[in-house]
């Protein structure tokens, strides 16, 4: 019961409202608020009232404008960057080394036989276009050539360029010219790409024939190697004991057994030192070459694939532990016959994350499936971009590219199963839409480590020491008293920390919530002398205004609802005498003038005396409905 009574009182209080009019509320607010200005509006003369009203309105607008500026600045999520440098004991970076040639030519020559013969014939046609090709074309296998041929574009007449097939089938869109030839100065080599049915063809132009034949050979070699089993490809590459001749980390000796092998399609067998997958990460506590990693490599360039690897040297990359080495995009070359010294400075980037920076902690919030997770590596933006491209490749070309990991259940592209894959792949590779889509979907890592390298080189070995160094290395690797190595095939590497080995770049919010509140309060206090309590007072009067408005609207709706069912009077309103008679005719007797049908008076008809006092004031005479009334006791209790 007490709860019900309390709720009833609350209901009556809500129905009654604040008990003030709009004007009374405004006057009360101006008299009681702690904000400067409103009190002067009601206490001064007419002129000062107008002046203070305008000043208060102006400063209130200034405060609102300044608040909008500060809130907009806060919601822009700007960051400030702090930089710190120094030297400390750090984990030595993972070092990935590869050979420029992915395979030994002696082991893949049987796979590339037809392609190499075709390549030699192409070079002959480019270098000697007037020579006879009848004997050459008879022994060539044109199966590969027919899928993606090279053509010559005769641009001696810019208005009517002529497209010529290298092996005799000359054609032009308007004027065929069989047997036409042109020299290298007047022609450009291009690659013709056609769809499966041959109805749609495009030409990919190059500024140099070297670029054209290299890209064409790599494209055809990709088709061949994509059909070879992965374990067979590993066997065709360079073995670790053949490429890694010597290893020293600080004062501790190491060997090829301290390297983790990984197959990278562009460079074949690669080897990673200090990757941290199965072994403990090695630290480095001192700067200088004596405390770093020293390697001697044999790249064996005498066994390079002639048309596949045109660069001789070692390809290497420094990266963080448990990350996949994207050595094609981020690696560097070390030249054969030199000693290359690499001083390392570690940049640690610590981004703030959403909403300040569009980055990800581990890639879990990225829509692209990371295909490199099969290597148990961490997320990187390169892994996301490559996975995104492979996803587009599968959706548009129905097959995956040989250079990227393959999702489960899919097949690599090749000319036999997917005849127009090259046309689809090169169109997708040049698509701006595809690149923009992948860039918009992939995010940078919030915590990233980059290695800045200072590189210096010198000839190694020197002429004076070349003989004995090559003898020793040949004896250690091949147990031969003769020199089996060449200066053109060996590379020496020194990788070490510099004097300052780390630099931390950290983001922090430029504007936090404390900054926002202090600026909002400062502007309000400066222009109007207010505080948080003044805002609460203003909020209170706004609530009262809304309260009064709602009560008035409810009362107006109720009044309209009551008036609608009442029918208008058919005659004139009753007089006072008739109203009094209604209260005095207790027996509900008929009128004295009423008669029977034949003029006879009713026998029980009586004339009652008219009272001398007015009728009592019963509740039934109230003009206001009961549901809007409340007792005096309830009002006093509230």
Swiss-Prot record:
Lineage of the organism: Eukaryota, Metazoa, Chordata, Craniata, Vertebrata
Classification via InterPro entries: ENaC, ENaC_chordates, ENaC_CS
Protein name, per record: Epithelial sodium channel subunit beta
A single GO BP: potassium ion homeostasis
Organism whose genome encodes this protein: Mus musculus
Gene: Scnn1b
Matching NCBIfam families: ENaC
Location(s) in or outside the cell: Apical cell membrane; Cytoplasmic vesicle membrane
Family assignment from sequence similarity: Belongs to the amiloride-sensitive sodium channel (TC 1.A.6) family. SCNN1B subfamily.
Subunit (UniProt): Component of the heterotrimeric epithelial sodium channel (ENaC) composed of an alpha/SCNN1A, a beta/SCNN1B and a gamma/SCNN1G subunit. Interacts with WWP1 (via WW domains). Interacts with WWP2 (via WW domains); inhibits the channel. Interacts with the full-length immature form of PCSK9 (pro-PCSK9). Interacts (N-glycosylated) with BPIFA1; the interaction is direct and inhibits the proteolytic processing of SCNN1A and SCNN1G and the activation of ENaC.
Region described as Disordered: spans on this chain: 594-620
């Amino acid at each position: 019961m007490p709860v019900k009574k309390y709720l009833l009182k609350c209901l009556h209080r809500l129905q009654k409202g604040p008990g003030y009019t709009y004007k009374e509320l405004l006057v009360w607010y101006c008299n009681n608020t702690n904000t400067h200005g409103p009190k002067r509006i009601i206490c001064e003369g007419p002129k000062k009232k107008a002046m203070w009203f305008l000043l208060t309105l102006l400063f209130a607008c200034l405060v609102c404008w300044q608040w909008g500026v500060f809130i907009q600045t806060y919601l822009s999520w700007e960051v400030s960057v702090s930089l710190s440098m120094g030297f400390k004991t750090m984990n030595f970076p993972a070092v990935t080394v590869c050979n420029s040639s992915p395979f030994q030519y002696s082991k893949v020559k049987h796979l590339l036989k037809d392609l190499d013969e075709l390549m030699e014939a192409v070079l002959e046609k480019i270098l000697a276009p007037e020579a006879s090709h009848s004997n050459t074309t008879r022994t060539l296998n044109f199966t590969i050539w027919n899928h993606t041929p090279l053509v010559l574009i005769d641009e001696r007449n810019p208005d009517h360029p002529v497209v010529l097939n290298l092996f005799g089938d000359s054609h032009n869109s308007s004027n065929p010219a069989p047997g036409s030839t042109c020299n290298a100065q007047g022609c450009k080599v291009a690659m013709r790409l056609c769809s499966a049915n041959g109805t749609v063809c495009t030409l990919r132009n190059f500024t140099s024939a070297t670029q054209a034949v290299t890209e064409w050979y790599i494209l055809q070699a990709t088709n061949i190697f994509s059909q070879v089993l992965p374990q067979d490809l590993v066997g065709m590459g360079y073995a670790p004991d053949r490429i890694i001749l010597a290893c020293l980390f600080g004062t501790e000796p190491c060997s090829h057994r301290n390297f983790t092998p990984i197959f990278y399609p562009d460079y074949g067998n690669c080897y990673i030192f200090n990757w941290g997958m199965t072994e403990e990460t090695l630290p480095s506590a001192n700067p200088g070459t004596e405390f770093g990693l020293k390697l001697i490599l044999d790249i064996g360039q005498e066994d390079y694939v002639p048309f596949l690897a045109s660069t001789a040297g070692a390809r290497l990359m420094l990266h963080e532990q448990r990350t996949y080495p994207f050595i094609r995009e981020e690696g560097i070359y070390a030249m054969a016959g030199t000693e290359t010294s690499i001083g390392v400075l570690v940049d640690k980037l610590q981004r703030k994350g959403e909403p300040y920076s569009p980055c990800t902690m581990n890639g879990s919030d990225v829509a692209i499936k990371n295909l490199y997770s099969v290597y148990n590596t961490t997320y990187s933006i390169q892994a996301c971009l490559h996975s995104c491209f492979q996803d587009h490749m599968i959706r548009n070309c129905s097959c995956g590219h040989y250079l990227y990991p393959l999702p489960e259940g899919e097949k690599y592209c090749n000319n036999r199963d997917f005849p127009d894959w090259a046309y689809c792949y090169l169109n997708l590779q040049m698509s701006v839409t595809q690149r923009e889509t992948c860039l918009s979907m992939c995010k940078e890592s919030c915590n990233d480590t980059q290695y800045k390298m200072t590189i210096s080189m010198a000839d190694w070995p020197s002429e004076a020491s070349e003989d004995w160094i090559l003898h020793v290395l040949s004896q250690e690797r091949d147990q031969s008293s003769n020199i089996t190595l060449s200066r053109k095939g060996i590379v020496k590497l020194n990788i070490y920390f510099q004097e300052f080995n780390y630099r931390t770049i950290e983001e922090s919010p430029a504007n936090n919530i404390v900054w926002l509140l202090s600026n909002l309060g400062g502007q309000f206090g400066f222009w109007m002398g207010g505080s948080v309590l003044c805002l609460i007072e203003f909020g209170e009067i706004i609530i009262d205004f809304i309260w009064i408005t709602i009560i008035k609207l409810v009362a107006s709706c109720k009044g309209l609802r009551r008036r609608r069912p009442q029918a208008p009077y058919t005659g004139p309103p009753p007089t006072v005498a008739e109203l009094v008679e209604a209260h005095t005719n207790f027996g509900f007797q008929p009128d004295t003038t009423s008669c029977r049908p034949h003029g006879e008076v009713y026998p029980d008809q009586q004339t009652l005396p008219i009272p001398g006092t007015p009728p009592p004031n019963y509740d039934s005479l109230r003009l206001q409905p009961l549901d809007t009334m409340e007792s005096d006791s309830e009002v006093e209790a509230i």
